A protein has these predicted regions:
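Hydrophobic residues within alpha-helical transmembrane segments
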Residues: 10-13, 57, 89-93, 112, ...
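Interfacial helix-start motif at the membrane-water boundary
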Residues: 46-61
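Interfacial loop-to-transmembrane junctions
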Residues: 97-119
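Helix-boundary and loop/linker segments of multi-pass membrane transporters
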Residues: 1, 40-47, 77
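Core segments of transmembrane alpha-helices
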Residues: 58-71
């Protein structure tokens, strides 16, 4: 297993953790009946921390398919180098840091970390595509 695939697997575990944490906080606020029910009726917005963790998870889901595709392109082209490894690390560790930064409400640092993690995707993809050419 390459570093990039290991970090892809680690990101899946991070996503599961974020999903369960956000769901737990939402259930704490809205109750078990809401969680077990069909959720047909509109509900008020989540509170501060539950809402932030829900949005952090949704943000991960927006970028994760791009990261996964970039890793798989690198694997398919046989490109495995410092740039692909570095890009995968930037993405994963940026996403790890993003969760507590978003939960704490720290705006500019959170955005900078998001930018670094997104740059990791670009780095990984560029290294895979241009090294294979």
């Amino acid at each position: 297993v390459t570093h990039e695939l290991a970090l892809l697997a680690a990101t899946i575990l991070l996503a599961l953790f974020q999903l369960m944490l956000a769901a737990r906080l939402a259930t704490r606020e809205r109750g078990m009946a809401w969680n077990a029910g069909p959720r047909d009726k509109a509900v008020p917005p989540l509170g501060t921390y539950a809402g932030r963790l829900d949005r952090a998870f949704k943000n991960l889901m927006e970028t994760f398919p791009l990261f996964a595709a970039a890793v798989l392109i690198a694997q398919a082209t046989g490109v495995h180098n410092g740039l692909t490894i570095g890009g995968a690390h930037l993405y994963f560790w940026g996403r790890v840091l993003y969760v507590p930064l978003y939960a704490s409400g720290l705006p500019y640092v959170r955005s900078a970390v998001w930018s670094l993690s997104t740059f990791g995707i670009v780095l990984l993809l560029a290294a895979a595509v241009f090294s294979a050419a």
